[in-house]
Design a protein with these regions (language model features):
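Extracellular loop and loop/strand-boundary signature of outer-membrane beta-barrel proteins
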Residues: 49-52, 95-97, 139-145, 179-184
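Transmembrane beta-strands of outer-membrane beta-barrel pores
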Residues: 40-46, 68, 90-96, 130-136, ...
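Residues that define the transmembrane beta-barrel architecture of outer-membrane proteins
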Residues: 32-34, 56-62, 100-107, 122, ...
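Short glycine/proline- and aromatic-enriched beta-strand/turn motifs that initiate or cap beta-hairpins
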Residues: 19-69, 192, 197-199
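Transmembrane beta-barrel domains of outer membrane proteins
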Residues: 65-69, 76, 112-116, 150, ...
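Short loop/turn motifs that connect adjacent beta-strands in outer-membrane beta-barrel proteins
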Residues: 21-34, 70-84, 116-124, 163-167
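Cleavable N-terminal export/targeting peptides
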Residues: 1-30
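Transmembrane beta-strands of outer-membrane beta-barrel proteins
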Residues: 34-40, 82-90, 122-130, 168-170, ...
């Protein structure tokens, strides 16, 4: 299965032409440009901080998003050359191997920095931000989640692959869910999330 997935990824990366020939580098990453996209992936909870064993939960991660370039190309001709994006997303985390309990989230306070280079057709990126959600997982994770309303914290890294039209990305996120002490208990859940993203 891993070999098939690896082969598919390599095919996607190689089969399409580099974006630079179709569109000027600075135009593509101009300040004010916007795009829609999405993240599809899988997550699993883990013990952070270490201590009492947390509830084991696995979930599908389905989050459409919107981005706006806030800066255009900054720090030119340096290792930090890139662009800062406002990132807004809303979507669904659906538990697997349970009764399909869910979390519906909205995160309007996120930023994504892409390390850009006109000689590459890919860019590493960093994403951080916050949002809020409603969920019905408190019965299966009562020790960690004491209320339906929860806050969300996101932090992650990825690699974005540029195509003539649109992009693909491969990402890792740390996904934190807690209610900030509104109700007890408030241990919270932390998850590793791996996603495949796309933009158009």
């Amino acid at each position: 299965m891993r070999r098939i997935l690896f082969f598919w990824i390599v095919t996607v990366v190689i089969a399409n032409p580099v974006f630079v020939g179709a569109q000027n580098f600075s135009d593509r990453f101009a300040k004010g440009n916007t795009s829609f996209g999405g993240e599809l992936g899988f997550g699993h909870t883990f013990n952070l901080p270490p201590g009492k064993d947390r509830t084991d939960l696995s979930f599908a991660f389905i989050f459409p998003n919107w981005q706006k370039n806030l800066t255009g190309i900054i720090a030119p001709d340096s290792l930090m050359q890139g662009a800062l994006y406002w990132h807004v997303e809303a979507g669904l985390a659906l538990l697997t191997h349970r009764d399909h309990e869910y979390l519906i989230g909205f995160s309007p306070l996120m930023v994504n920095y892409k390390f850009l280079n006109s000689q590459r057709k890919w860019a590493p990126n960093i994403l951080v931000g916050a949002g809020f959600s409603m969920q019905d997982c408190e019965e299966v994770a009562h020790y960690e989640l004491g209320s339906e309303f929860q806050f969300l914290l996101h932090g992650g890294v990825g690699v974005e692959l540029f195509r003539e039209s649109g992009t693909y990305s491969f990402n890792y996120w740390l996904f934190h869910v807690s209610n900030a002490g509104i109700e007890k208990p408030n241990i919270g859940l932390n998850s590793h999330v791996f996603t495949l993203g796309f933009r158009f």
